[in-house]
């Protein structure tokens, strides 16, 4: 714990300077970001980030420069800083070391990020899951709460050493929900909805300098339409950061492979001022970079854990500790 506090004390001034410099000289600052990323000890993760930024630096017409300018013009820098440190150091560096050690010790898969479905009625269950997950080195969480509750906001607030991506409906964004997150800096909200709902939500989020993204769903039937240029352009108005693509139900391997390769292609082309992420495939890719595994897990509101290593057996975290559930997925 002391070592982690010391590491944060060393990293935080570098992040502060980097964010300050981004406003004045994005291109030069990005070169400093490259140096900072390479200073992190997790080589596999650093090298992949380095490759992405190098492509950006060699492309003078990259839309990612527009992305950066949009971020620094509206976003609360404390929000970006807290989320980045928690994700970059606590989750992907310090926590990842614990994950690798416990994974070897127990000969099981432990994910770098845990997806959790929740609502007001299941907040105690969610809080307990996160408590157990942190003991395993997991400090990155994707929380799915369609109608954001005060209980969910409080869970994110008290776990301020973690990074949260909160997936919710755009219709849930209101003065009330924005006020609930007024002092919470370790969260990225991702919204989904109709054009009118997205327009209203993004206006409110920008006005309040919130860190947010947008997400959309795909399945075997509509996966090809995800990459239509008209649709890619459509999302430009509703995110300054990420476009998260999420499978709606069990997709065929063909669909998953198609999404993986084409999402990477969109990122490499750098034509749109957001970063496209395929939640399923990119979660696995990052997991492999960080832990050497290829594992993802989601826990539904009933406490059932599902993973990409499914064998048809259901395991419930209300019947046994999280680690014991993960031990069911032997390497």
Predicted regions and their residues:
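Extended hydrophobic/Leu-rich segments
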Residues: 102, 255-256, 326
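Solvent-exposed, charged interface segments at domain starts and junctions
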Residues: 9-38, 113, 199-219, 223-227
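A short acidic, amphipathic alpha-helical/loop segment
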Residues: 128-132, 151-156, 175-180, 197-205, ...
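N-terminal [4Fe-4S]-dependent radical SAM core
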Residues: 43-115
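Core AdoMet radical
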Residues: 112-124, 133-149, 159-174, 180-197, ...
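Accessory C-terminal segments flanking Radical SAM cores
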Residues: 1-31, 35-47, 263-331
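N-terminal start-of-chain detector that recognizes signal peptides
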Residues: 85-91, 138, 160-163, 269-271
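Conserved C-terminal portion of the radical SAM core fold
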Residues: 118, 140, 199-306
């Amino acid at each position: 714990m002391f070592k982690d506090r010391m590491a944060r004390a060393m990293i935080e001034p570098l992040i502060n300077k980097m964010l300050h410099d981004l406003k004045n000289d994005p291109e030069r600052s990005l070169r400093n970001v490259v140096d900072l990323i390479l200073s992190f000890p997790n080589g596999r993760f650093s090298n992949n980030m380095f490759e992405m930024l190098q492509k950006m630096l060699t492309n003078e017409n990259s839309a990612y420069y527009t992305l950066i300018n949009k971020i620094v013009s509206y976003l609360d820098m404390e929000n970006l800083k807290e989320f980045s440190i928690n994700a970059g150091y606590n989750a992907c560096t310090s926590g990842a070391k614990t994950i690798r050690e416990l994974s070897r010790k127990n000969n099981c898969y432990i994910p770098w990020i845990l997806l959790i479905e929740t609502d007001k009625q299941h907040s105690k269950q969610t809080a307990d899951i996160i408590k157990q997950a942190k003991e395993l080195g997991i400090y990155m969480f994707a929380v799915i709460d369609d109608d954001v509750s005060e209980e969910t906001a409080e869970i994110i607030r008290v776990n301020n050493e973690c990074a949260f991506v909160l997936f919710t409906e755009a219709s849930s964004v209101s003065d009330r929900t924005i006020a609930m997150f007024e002092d919470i800096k370790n969260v990225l909200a991702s919204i989904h909805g109709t054009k009118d709902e997205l327009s209203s939500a993004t206006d409110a989020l920008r006005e309040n300098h919130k860190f947010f993204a947008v997400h959309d769903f795909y399945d075997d039937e509509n996966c090809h339409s995800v990459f239509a240029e008209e649709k890619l352009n459509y999302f430009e108005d509703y995110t300054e950061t990420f476009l998260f693509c999420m499978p709606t139900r069990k997709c065929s391997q063909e669909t998953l492979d198609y999404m993986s390769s084409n999402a990477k292609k969109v990122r490499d082309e750098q034509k749109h001022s957001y970063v496209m992420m395929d939640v399923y495939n990119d979660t696995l890719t990052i997991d492999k970079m960080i832990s050497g595994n290829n594992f993802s897990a989601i826990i539904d509101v009933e406490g059932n854990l599902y993973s990409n290593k499914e064998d048809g057996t259901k395991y419930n975290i209300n019947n046994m500790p999280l680690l014991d559930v993960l031990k069911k997925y032997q390497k």
